[in-house]
Amino acid sequence: MKFSIGLRWEEWEADYSDSLQESFNPTDKMSGGKISLIKSMTNGTNMYASLAKGYKQGGFNLGLGLDANSTNQNLAYDPEFLTNYELGINTKLLDSKINFNGVLFYSNREDQQVLISTQTDPSDPNTFSFLTQNAAEGVNHGLEINMDMDINQSLSAFVNLGILKTEIKNWQSRQDLEGRAQAHAPERSYALGLNWAPTSHTYLAIDFTGKSSFYYSDSHNNKSKSYVLTNLNLGYVKNNWNYELWARNIFDEYYSVRGFYFGNEAPNFIDTLYERHGDPRHIGVSIRYDF
């Protein structure tokens, strides 16, 4: 059995002043570290348990167009701290034809940094912007599984699966969002694919990646739809050169990756959802030389 420990300490200082006469000098002292136990079995299986604490420093929201009545409550945000617990396993099955990795995790986020949208003038869409604030607490837990399989000498496959549950907790300024999932945290994500190499110079690869629906933002309750993308690669390799014909999103799936909710259309400037969509089908050629 192996035991490892790591520690980190940081002191962060900053100076802020602007044309609205806001001026302050925040100082944050942050610490983190990791403790892990690793058990190696005789059959090549490794199991581990870890406890880690990390942090993300605070900062400022710039370019918000805030008026003179605004306070530094909107301008500055505090550090976020994360405590993470993990149990994991790595093993090889069927005479090393399958490589399996699995992780169970639970994370507690304190002073969670959340990205929200604001519009200082409801009748002026040019005042729409994003800012970071602190929610009191957030919780993440889930499962990750990765498998690589050698089916035969020329055919291999992979499967990646993620299950994630998240929750916003104890957010005093937005109690309506307490208990809701965090933004951009789909409950299910996956990828699977096949790689076929009929000769030492040629290969064909196809993969499918998908996500379930997720909330666009921590400032409104609009969600994306689930989607699956299909990608294809056809390649030729010789003398350190790699020639590849590829296609991304070959079925031209229409899907959204971001969502913005604000008033933009006169005369009433009613809050409306505007979505940014992912890349459509695109095809290309790549040439690479490996030294």
PLM features per residue range, with description:
Residues 1, 29, 37-40, 53, ...:
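Residue-level signature of outer-membrane beta-barrel architecture
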Residues 1-3, 44-47, 95-100, 154-157, ...:
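Repeated loop/turn-to-beta-strand initiation elements of outer-membrane beta-barrel proteins
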Residues 1-42, 177:
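Signature of Gram-negative outer-membrane beta-barrel scaffolds
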Residues 9-15, 51-57, 64-66, 93, ...:
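Transmembrane beta-strands of outer-membrane beta-barrel pores
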Residues 11, 106-108, 127, 131-218, ...:
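Gram-negative outer-membrane beta-barrel transporters
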Residues 47-48, 76-141, 150, 162, ...:
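Membrane-embedded beta-barrel scaffold of Gram-negative outer-membrane proteins
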Residues 68-70, 168, 183-237, 248-252, ...:
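C-terminal beta-barrel architecture of Gram-negative outer-membrane proteins
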Residues 108-110, 115, 157, 211-215, ...:
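C-terminal beta-signal and adjacent terminal beta-strands/loops
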